[in-house]
């Protein structure tokens, strides 16, 4: 299927605007015929001694009329064709962004940020140029060439016209071969640009780590290698691009030589006039643009085709986590029950035989060593992944029976790697609901024990925190992320190791606030520091994806297992730190 067929949905969507633009292009092509025709008549009148002042003024009027008409119509087709093409860019970017929001974490492990950015910028820009400059070139070149050739054929000399177009088949063959090479080269240059984008994004994000290890020289060398590869790929593409215009001009020059040779002989024989020859050469000059446009069109079409293939491949990726065909309505918080027989991530068994339940309003603590499966339990509840064997039930229904947006609307999630936007503290906290009053924001920050930190800043809640909260400490980032979740007062609050960068005293105050404000709400806390879950109604100890201990804090201490030993060890460490202070 050709790229034009693939974009036909857009041309149908904007058919009225494109139709107006094409009509304007046709009229410009017709008006373009007037100046050479007028010139030929004036030259013949001068050589025949028949030119009067009235005829001269009338011909000048025709020229001015044609010039003003073309000026206005060129403005129209630019607005209606080139202007409309930007609409395609807008639609495709929206499609891509919507697609990104629906994809599972596995998708983002396959595609890197820089690669996705390249699709949303360079590839879509190539499509925009095709829908604008490409359509304009195709229509304008076709109409101009057709109208001009017909005029040359029937109003001047069909013999000269046939001679003039003799080089065209050879040009078409050469252009086709060059187009195929351009297609391949542009695909490689776009892939190289994606890699460069990835490298820049990764290098800038990790600049602190690079400096701390004194790795600047090696990182610069690595970047220069990627940069050089991108340069070479772009240079190869430009090499083929640069061949188009000289090649077209070579064939156009051949047409001029043949026309002058045959035309001069015909003038000598009296078959045509000097004015006819001048008009014919002027028309031939007008054919230069259509011939050049063929090269431009081949170039821009190949680029658009490559970019559309890349975008199409991206949009064809489907998330393994989907909404049910017949979703349940009216989701409500209630009894949460895990009944997981097994779950594998990337073909590796992650969770096995996970069975427990949590009543509405209770708190669940998940503890265990790193990699024990705590976060996997959270991801399954959020439906970032789906259970292989078994199910998770909420209020008696499999969570897969609810729409994703409905399920997640019940939850406030604070992940291990919290993400903050490069805006103000106020905007970050109100991210879930920008219309919340300042009083609600202040209350949420007090619950998360970050209020005083904020008011001590010169700009207070209007402080711009930089990309990913770069101006804040680790503990401040965690507490801001908690404020963002807590301000929504979710039915299910999930804190995934969200207190790791907070000191023990602040942690105790936050936990105390949670106990007070979330008596009728479900709370799930994963932690390495066991003091964060001592108040939980149910604590699960995970090891290698299995539950090895369960119960309340007192129950687990009585078991004298992993939990009790770890808790006692951590308490001794905390006491030692306090004594040292």
Question: What residue ranges belong to the model's regions?
Answer:
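A short amphipathic helical element positioned immediately N-terminal to and/or at the very start
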Residues: 1-15, 116
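An intracellular "coupling" helix at the cytosolic face of ABC transporter transmembrane type-1 domains
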Residues: 15, 105-106, 122-131, 135, ...
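Transmembrane helix-loop-helix hairpins at lipid-water interfaces of multipass membrane proteins
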Residues: 18-73, 154-159, 271-274
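Hydrophobic alpha-helical transmembrane segments of ABC transporter permease domains
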Residues: 23, 34, 121-166, 251-255, ...
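Short intracellular "coupling" helices and adjacent cytoplasmic loop segments at the cytosolic face
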Residues: 86, 94-118, 122-124, 198-222, ...
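Small-residue-enriched core segments of transmembrane alpha-helices in multipass membrane transport
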Residues: 163-178, 279-288
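Cytosolic ends of transmembrane helices, especially the final helix of ABC transmembrane type-1 domains
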Residues: 215, 239, 286-314
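ABC-type nucleotide-binding domain
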Residues: 331-581
């Amino acid at each position: 299927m050709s790229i034009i067929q693939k974009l036909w949905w857009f041309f149908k969507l904007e058919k009225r605007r494109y139709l107006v633009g094409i009509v304007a292009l046709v009229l410009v092509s017709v008006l373009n015929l007037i100046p050479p025709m007028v010139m030929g008549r004036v030259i013949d009148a001068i050589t025949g001694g028949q030119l009067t002042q009235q005829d001269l003024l009338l011909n000048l009027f025709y020229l001015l009329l044609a010039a003003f008409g073309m000026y206005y119509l060129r403005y129209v087709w630019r607005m209606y064709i080139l202007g409309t093409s930007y609409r395609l860019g807008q639609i495709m970017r929206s499609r891509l962004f919507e697609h990104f929001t629906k994809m599972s974490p596995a998708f983002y492990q396959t595609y890197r940020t820089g690669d996705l950015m390249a699709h949303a910028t360079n590839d879509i820009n190539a499509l925009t140029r095709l829908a604008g400059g490409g359509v304009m070139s195709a229509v304008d070149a076709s109409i101009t060439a057709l109208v001009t050739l017909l005029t040359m054929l029937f109003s001047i000399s069909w013999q000269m016209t046939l001679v003039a177009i003799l080089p065209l088949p050879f040009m078409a063959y050469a252009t086709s071969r060059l187009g195929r090479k351009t297609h391949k080269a542009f695909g490689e240059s776009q892939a190289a640009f994606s890699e460069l984008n990835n490298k820049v994004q990764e290098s800038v994000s990790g600049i602190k780590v690079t400096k701390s290890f004194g790795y600047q020289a090696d990182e610069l060398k690595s970047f220069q290698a990627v940069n050089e590869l991108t340069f070479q790929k772009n240079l190869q593409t430009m090499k083929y691009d640069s061949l188009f215009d000289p090649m077209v001009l070579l064939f156009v020059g051949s047409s001029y030589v043949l026309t002058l040779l045959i035309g001069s002989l015909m003038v000598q024989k009296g078959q045509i006039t000097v004015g006819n020859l001048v008009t014919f050469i002027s028309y031939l000059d007008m054919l230069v643009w259509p011939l050049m446009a063929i090269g431009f069109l081949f170039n821009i079409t190949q680029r658009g085709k490559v970019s559309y293939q890349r975008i199409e491949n991206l949009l064809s990726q489907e998330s393994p986590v989907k909404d049910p065909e017949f979703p349940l309505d009216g989701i409500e918080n209630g009894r949460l029950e895990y009944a997981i027989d097994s779950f594998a991530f990337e073909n590796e068994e992650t969770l096995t035989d996970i069975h427990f339940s949590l009543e509405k309003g209770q708190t669940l603590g998940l503890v265990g060593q790193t990699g024990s499966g705590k976060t996997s339990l959270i991801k399954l509840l959020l439906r970032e992944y789906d259970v292989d064997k078994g199910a998770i039930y909420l209020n008696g229904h499999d969570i897969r029976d609810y729409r994703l947006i409905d399920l997640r609307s019940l939850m406030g999630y604070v992940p291990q790697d919290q993400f903050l936007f490069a805006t103000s503290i106020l905007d970050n906290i109100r991210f879930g609901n920008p219309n919340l009053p300042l009083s609600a924001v202040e209350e949420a920050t007090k619950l998360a024990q970050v209020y005083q930190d904020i008011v001590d800043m010169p700009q207070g809640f209007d402080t711009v925190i930089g990309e990913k909260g770069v101006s804040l400490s680790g503990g401040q980032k965690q507490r801001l992320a908690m404020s963002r979740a807590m301000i929504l007062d979710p039915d299910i609050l999930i804190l995934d190791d969200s207190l790791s960068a907070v000191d023990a005293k602040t942690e105790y105050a936050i936990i105390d606030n949670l106990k007070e404000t979330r008596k009728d709400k479900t709370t799930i806390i994963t932690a390495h520091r066991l003091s964060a879950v001592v108040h939980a109604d149910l604590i699960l100890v995970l090891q290698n994806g299995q539950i090895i201990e369960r119960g309340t804090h007192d129950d687990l201490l009585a078991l004298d297992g992993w939990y009790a030993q770890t808790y006692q060890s951590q308490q001794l460490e905390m006491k030692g730190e306090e004594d040292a202070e």
